[in-house]
Amino acid sequence: NAFVKGADIGWLPQMEATGYTFYDQDGTEKECLQLLKDRGMNSVRLRVWVNPNTDKASGHCSKEETVAMALRAQKMGMRVMINFHYSDSWADPAKQTKPAAWATHTFSQLLDDVYNHTQEVLNALKTAGVTPEWVQIGNEIPGGMLWPEGSTNNWKQLGQLLNKGYDATKAVDKNIKVIVHVDEGNNNTKFRTFFDNATSQNVKYDIIGLSYYPFWIKKDYTETIADLEFNLNDM
């Protein structure tokens, strides 16, 4: 397979809805994905929120919009990754807020919610003619997801939630590669702690995903790049 060169384009519909236009270096207006493809990008990552609001500036990443964006990318020959946040808005290391519709659900219901939402979105994509190459279960989840039930304070429950996402994905297409994703890719201790616990709970996945943002680490990348290399090799 070709080396993956991609980007998360989840904000593109928001930018287009609020009037952004994109231009080539010579001043010619072009569609954003075409500009990216012209520069060698061959893959996109699309995030999915459960019930986002409808504000044109912040209310994006619904199932319907994700399907539309995936189709746009596929028609340009790009490979597709779907990133499930299991939230109505951003989920990240600082917040893993349950969707409002799931807020009062029992843990047993949350297991069904994860399975059904994952399967529903992937089936909608499949019906539209798009089968993603990768599916990410949760977004930057060193502390778990769907707090508090899916916190890393309760690995037994977190493991079950992650496996529900895996099982739903494979039920749609067994060839989709499932990713589990943690931030701060230069921090081997964080990754060892997370994935050793995941192994102890028999969490199923195909790929370890990591983020590495020197800007947020607050150090020059030259101070942490060797740590990133060590962690990649260790994982």
Regions flagged by a language model, labelled:
Residues H85, K170, Y213:
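Histidine-centered active-site/metal-ligand motif
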Residues N1-R79, H85-V114, E120, Q136, ...:
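N-terminal substrate-binding region of glycoside hydrolase catalytic domains
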Residues G59-V67, A91-T199, V203-Y205, I217-F230, ...:
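Active-site cleft segment of glycoside hydrolase catalytic domains centered on the general acid/base Glu
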